[in-house]
Regions:
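Short, Lys/Arg-rich, polar N-terminal cytosolic tail immediately upstream
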Residues: 2, 6-32
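A structural signal for multi-pass alpha-helical bundles of membrane permease subunits
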Residues: 30-329
């Protein structure tokens, strides 16, 4: 009679494998359930984007037509690329395009530097009550409308009764006609934009900073590292993903601008159009003159250029993120 040998090692290994399979099955079911939950959570947002962004995009066909309101979109004659030719031949186009890109570049740099600086200061603060107070102060301007912000700017820079001119007059100086001085408005608009948006940017960066271990910064302090060294060597490398995310969002709109902001802050003063006219304000006036095909061509060009810019930054971000991971690990 053949003896059956009992190998405890084989039994133990088989048990481990069975447990691993069971655990893997549980994890897979959990992942599937989580994916379904995330899908239904994001579904309303996806529907809103499709309804309000993708479906209306079909009206860009106007850019290729000689659109007449009385004849409608379908009844209007095809114009091919004529509207785009007129756009590029417009004598103001290059100047306005440059204004738009420069403004958005300045917005991106100033807002991100201010937001990252504020978030880092909050992260380094120890007192929770002070953190909460300053976060509220930073975010509050974001909820102020540009109409009200425009009134604040007008109260400061009004040619006749502005606070700044009153202070200048008090010290014996001559009043400055701010709304007839184009050179100062890029600075005013950039500072106003930063005041309104840097707080929200700081919230995003502050959330990213929460993933950093305080032990690392404390160890660096014990080794004698200064604040700048801690920021550049510990904090910044770990929030690069958030920096790139904000960069992609901002770069995608580099050829667009906030129409309400420019009109409310400048009050559409003709004397400063040279430095405050951007694509949105210029071509919105084209819509007011019923030249809708021309304005649609400008809008389509803005969207296409923004998509290309965002794609370029996304590729750059992916490459830099992979390089950073290789350097760390």
């Amino acid at each position: 009679m053949r003896e059956h040998r009992f190998n405890i090692d084989n039994v133990f290994l088989r048990g481990i494998k069975d447990m691993a399979k069971a655990e893997h099955g549980k994890n897979k079911r959990k992942k599937d359930t989580s994916a379904i939950k995330l899908f239904f959570m994001s579904l309303p947002a996806v529907i809103l984007i499709i309804v309000f962004n993708y479906i209306p995009a079909g009206e860009y066909i106007i850019a290729f037509k000689d659109y007449k309101i009385g004849r409608g979109i379908i009844g209007s004659d095809w114009a091919g690329l004529e509207n785009f030719r007129l756009l590029f031949e417009n004598i103001h186009f290059n100047k306005i395009l440059l204004n738009t890109v420069l403004y958005n570049s300045a917005f991106f740099v100033v807002v991100n530097v201010a937001g990252l600086g504020a978030a880092t200061l909050l992260f380094r603060l120890k007192n929770l009550h002070i953190k909460v107070f300053f976060r509220a102060v930073l975010v509050l301007p974001y909820f102020i409308s540009w109409v009200f912000a425009g009134e604040i700017v007008y109260a400061l820079f009004s040619n006749d009764s502005g606070i700044i001119n009153q202070v200048i007059g008090f010290f014996g100086g001559e009043k400055v006609l701010w709304y007839n001085t184009p050179a100062v408005w890029p600075v005013i608009i950039t500072l106003a934009f930063a005041w309104k948006n840097a707080g929200v940017c700081s919230v995003v960066y502050y959330a990213a900073l929460q993933g950093i271990d305080h032990g690392m910064t404390e160890a660096a302090e014990l080794d004698g590292a200064g604040e700048f060294r801690i920021f550049s060597d510990i904090i910044l490398p770990q929030i690069l993903l958030a920096v790139f995310l904000i960069a992609v969002i901002n770069i995608s709109g580099i050829f667009k601008s906030d129409y309400e902001m420019f009109t409310q802050l400048t009050r559409e003063s003709g004397g400063i159009f040279g430095t405050t006219d951007v694509l949105d304000t210029y071509f919105r006036r084209g819509m007011q003159t019923t030249d809708l095909s021309f304005s649609a061509a400008a809008g389509l060009l803005q969207s296409a250029a923004g998509c290309l810019a965002a794609f370029f930054v996304l590729c750059l971000a992916r490459r830099e993120n992979n390089r950073f991971r290789r350097d760390i690990f």
